[in-house]
Swiss-Prot record:
Residues 20-79 bind DNA. It holds the Pfam family Homeodomain. Residues 16-26, 281-292 have a biased composition (Basic and acidic residues). This is Tetrapeptide repeat homeobox protein 2. Gene3D superfamilies: Homeodomain-like. Keywords: Developmental protein, DNA-binding, Homeobox, Nucleus, Repressor, Transcription, Transcription regulation. Residues 1-27, 273-301 are annotated as: Disordered. It comes from the Eukaryota. It is found in: Nucleus. InterPro entries: HD, Homeobox_CS, Homeodomain-like_sf. GO terms for molecular function: DNA-binding transcription factor activity, RNA polymerase II-specific; RNA polymerase II cis-regulatory region sequence-specific DNA binding. Transcription factor expressed after fertilization required for zygotic genome activation (ZGA), a critical event in early embryonic development during which the developmental control passes from maternally provided mRNAs to the expression of the zygotic genome after fertilization. Binds and activates expression of key ZGA marker genes, such as NANOGNB, ZSCAN4, DUXB, KLF5 and DPPA3. Binds to regulatory DNA sequences containing a 5'-TAATCC-3' sequence motif. It comes from Homo sapiens. GO terms for biological process: maternal-to-zygotic transition of gene expression; regulation of transcription by RNA polymerase II.
């Protein structure tokens, strides 16, 4: 029989041993003074120099190699800090901004707006310690009297408008107002309706027809009545479309009575007697002559 150990693979490799941390070397004051003295002479000593110095200080050569390496890094860090500008005390961290090196100059005249670098410059406000910009404070700027003149009624001071700060977002503007409909109310009582209403569309109203008066006859001296054939016939009305609500009257129906049937025909004898009586009456009164021309009172003048 085969050994079951041969069927299995090689044993799993164990975790590599961790590198032990080197203990921190503690130097005495006398050792530090000697190392500093040699560092001022040469910052990069070679192997032989380090070996001789290690025997003199009772140290290992590897310890001196690490000390010189750390001392060179410390010197480079100090030089880098000296080249950077000074920071405002109280602001620490990578996000802190450098303080302005140039102080803010005073205004040219009191009471006017402040322009540190000139009239065309602008200084942005510095944020607070929590990164919030301070609120704008209203200021009063006074203008000189010569600007507006003595006769002009200029104001003594103009109040600056503060910058808009953070505030609530205004509500959306409402849409166009709807026009309200008619106010519902009680409908007027029209009373009981006996039947369906018949709406009649009126036709064109004809003009009033005037009956012609008696026509005087210049030969016989009497008046003549016009016959039925001499009356003007009315024009036919416009045809209207048929509607179920229209009345039964047709457009051709005459809306006025026939005056010829109402007036009886006068005989010639009655006409002659009527005209003779009228002429005699005028002659007796003395106002109009037989020819009915003009009054006599006007001729005497």
């Amino acid at each position: 029989m085969q050994d079951p150990g041969h069927l299995q693979g090689p044993p799993l490799a164990l975790d590599p041993p961790r590198r032990q941390r080197q203990e921190r070397t503690v130097y005495t004051e006398s050792q530090q003074k000697v190392l500093e003295f040699y560092f001022q002479k040469d910052q990069y000593p070679n192997y032989d120099q380090r070996l001789n110095l290690a025997e003199m200080l009772s140290l290992r050569e590897q310890q001196l190699q690490v000390w010189f390496k750390n001392r060179r890094a410390k010197l480079a860090r100090e030089r880098r800090l000296q080249q950077q500008p000074q920071r405002v005390p109280g602001q620490r961290g990578r996000g802190a901004r450098a303080a302005p090196l140039v102080p803010v100059a005073a205004a040219s005249f009191p009471g006017g707006p402040e322009f540190p670098q000139g009239r065309g410059s602008w200084i942005s406000p510095q944020p607070g310690p929590w990164g919030v910009l301070p609120a704008a404070e209203p200021k009063i700027y006074s203008l000189p009297r010569t600007w507006g003149g003595p006769e002009c009624g200029t104001q003594e001071g103009l109040k600056a408008v503060p910058a808009p700060g953070p505030g609530p977002i205004p509500a959306p503007i409402p849409g166009p107002a709807q026009i309200p409909g008619p106010v519902p109310g009680p409908a007027p009582n029209l009373g009981p309706m006996s039947g369906p209403l018949s709406v009649s569309i009126p036709g064109p109203i004809p003009a009033p027809i005037s009956c012609p008066g008696p026509i005087p006859d210049p030969v016989l001296g009497r008046t003549l009545m016009p016959g039925p054939g001499s009356l003007p016939t009315p024009a036919p009305g416009a045809l209207w479309p048929q509607s179920p609500y229209a009345s039964n009257l047709s457009p051709d129906t005459q809306l006025y009575p026939d005056f010829t049937k109402l007036l009886p025909l006068l005989d010639r004898f009655e006409e002659s007697s009527l005209s003779t009586t009228t002429s005699q009456y005028k002659e007796e009164d003395g106002f109009v002559d037989k020819n009915h021309s003009v009054p006599r009172s006007l001729l005497d003048l």
